[in-house]
């Protein structure tokens, strides 16, 4: 920092020039930077964003209970988007909206991936809201669960994050530092038409096993919530 000139001095190297060119690019292409003291600074005008109105659901919602009007709109929007994050606040009924969206779309079989402690709750909610039968995957049906879909006994299958490898992964071809392309899944994952990923913050890191498994299983599915 040069006190006399009031400027920063940097070495005249190619590396510094490249970084300076990049900085100049951002300054030119984004909002102009206004320099001055706090007293001299001007308040930028507020930017107003127009949020589109939510659609209304056409036809019967297909549930055993009557959803709230905002939930019906959420279901309608989910049917439009097909792949989306349900960002409703806690307690507003995200589970109902997700179940209703899959049920209305008839996107079965459906796989629900969730924390271990809420598997039974998801099963109860499916039975409470719809006439579909939900199964929690256990060791007793590790290899036979597709039979329950093929015979019409179950339409929904529920699994916790930690068990994805057990039920859906045939093998991983590398011992260390493996990526999704090194994972061989069982062909049974192709059966699913939809996937619900509950508590999806658990798959925010692309470096974790469960994120890679979720991505591989959900890839190509018409409905992903």
Sequence positions of predicted segments:
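Accessory DNA-engaging acidic/polar modules
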Residues: 1-62
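SF2 helicase/translocase NTPase motor core
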Residues: 44-77, 83-86, 92-210, 219-221
């Amino acid at each position: 920092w040069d006190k006399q000139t009031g400027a920063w001095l940097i070495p005249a190297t190619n590396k510094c020039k490249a970084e300076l060119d990049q900085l100049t690019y951002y300054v030119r292409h984004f909002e102009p930077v206004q320099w001055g003291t706090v007293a001299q600074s001007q308040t930028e005008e507020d930017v107003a964003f127009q949020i589109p109105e939510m659609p209304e659901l056409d036809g019967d919602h297909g549930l055993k209970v009557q959803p709230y009007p905002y939930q019906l709109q959420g279901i309608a929007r989910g049917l439009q988007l097909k792949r989306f994050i349900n960002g409703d606040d806690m307690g507003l009924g995200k589970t109902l909206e997700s179940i209703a969206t899959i049920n209305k779309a008839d996107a079965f079989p459906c796989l629900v991936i969730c924390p271990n402690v809420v598997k039974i709750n998801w099963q109860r909610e499916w039975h409470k809201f719809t006439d579909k039968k939900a199964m929690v995957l256990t060791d007793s049906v590790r290899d036979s669960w597709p039979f329950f879909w093929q015979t019409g006994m179950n339409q929904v299958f529920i699994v916790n994050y930690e068990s994805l490898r057990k039920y859906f992964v045939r093998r991983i071809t590398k011992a260390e530092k493996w990526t999704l392309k090194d994972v061989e899944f069982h062909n049974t994952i192709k059966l699913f038409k939809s996937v619900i990923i509950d508590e999806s913050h658990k798959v925010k890191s692309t470096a974790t096993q469960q994120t890679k498994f979720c991505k591989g299983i959900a890839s190509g599915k018409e409905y992903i919530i």
